[in-house]
Amino acid sequence: MEEYVYIDGKKYRRGYTTGSCATGASKAAVYMLITKNRINTINIDTPKGIPLLLKVDNINISDTFVECSIKKDGGDDIDATHTMDIYARAEIVAKNDKNKGYLTLKDIDSLSTNSECKSELYKFIRVYGGTGIGVVTKKGLSVDVGKPAINPTPLKMINHEIRKLIGDNFESILGNDKVLKITIFAPQGETVAKKTFNPRLGIVGGISIIGTTGIVEPMSDDGWKKSLSIELQMKKEQGLDKIILVPGNHGEQFIREKLNLDIKYVVRVSNFIGYMIKEAQRIGYKKILMAGHIGKFIKVSAGIFNTHSKVADARSEILVANLALMGARYEFLNKINQCVTTEEAVELINNSEYREVYNILSNKCRERVKQYLNEDSDDIDVEVIIFSMDKSLLGKSDNTDDLVEVFI
């Protein structure tokens, strides 16, 4: 794909999603099934408005079905699914097929006004998940439990492109007692899925077919943030009304090993702390416990809500400023300022009279979060815990113990 964007003066190539791959493979398979003509490329439209010309691989034409694949191309935003072959198998089967593990447009409530839905084409197209496509096992996702993890936009795209092929004369092609069965599969899917968020989201057995625009934007955090938010939504729909936010693995281990709390409450936020606390507020959580390494949360104490180093650092400056306000001597402040890592600074502080700085930072972190949530935060309890790399508790905000009690 030769579509480019410029970010910070650098040129990056766009890619296309697993949803676009599934759509292209489905359209190509249906075309070859109906016409019996072999093709090497296929055109599809994307919600982004960028048309794609996709190379069709691994073609298998038989008397009763056609299979083919499209290779996933993530452009310069390479993820776990990059270069995977996403397959579609098209076949015409009896309408009374007893296998109910399929999707149609009617599975998506928001499509009541969709043109494909109005045309009733959806009654004749059933999309299944095959080998390597995950199955949804938990509530809160955009697909019902027990269904294949094929998201709404790819499902719409598949139906739209097939309608472009068949038009509204599908009954004359399929007959009243037949339907078009599309099976999406990915032989590498089960292995690749282990490198994705799917296990945390309760999607088992393979990858998801995703993408809201059909196009992968390089250097974009949008997909990552959305995956994190989905876990928040999912836990809410499972009945949880309180949540523990941690940056990553270390936070999860701290919650499990040091606080002995159930990790069912834990959601990882990565560096997107501001985004995720806003999402927690939007979804309706009223009790939020935050636990993180001092190197991350010291930034939040100064109002930095994306903790990636490319966005902001200032860890030494924040620490020096708070120690100075406590009356620390210049020589000590200078040693802190020369530390390369916060862990190095922690070692100095732990052997000093200024250990209270950790609680001060925790309280400032809490107040910054409350300010970030604006006036709507009065009914939300937020408390903060800061720990070191060896999972030792360093500090906590004033009412942390009371909030921890509600998670026990």
From Swiss-Prot:
Reactions accelerated catalytically: Co-precorrin-5B + S-adenosyl-L-methionine = Co-precorrin-6A + S-adenosyl-L-homocysteine
Enzyme Commission number(s) of this protein: 2.1.1.195
GO molecular function terms noted in the UniProt entry: cobalt-precorrin-5B C1-methyltransferase activity
GO biological process: anaerobic cobalamin biosynthetic process; methylation
NCBIfam families to which the protein is assigned, alphabetical: cbiD
TM segment ranges: none
Top-level taxonomic group: Bacteria
Pfam family, one: CbiD
Alphabetical list of PANTHER family matching this protein: COBALT-PRECORRIN-5B C(1)-METHYLTRANSFERASE
Protein name as annotated: Cobalt-precorrin-5B C(1)-methyltransferase
Organism: Clostridioides difficile (strain 630)
Transferase in keyword set: yes
Pathway given in the UniProt record: Cofactor biosynthesis; adenosylcobalamin biosynthesis; cob(II)yrinate a,c-diamide from sirohydrochlorin (anaerobic route): step 6/10
Family designation: Belongs to the CbiD family.
Keywords: Cobalamin biosynthesis, Methyltransferase, S-adenosyl-L-methionine, Transferase
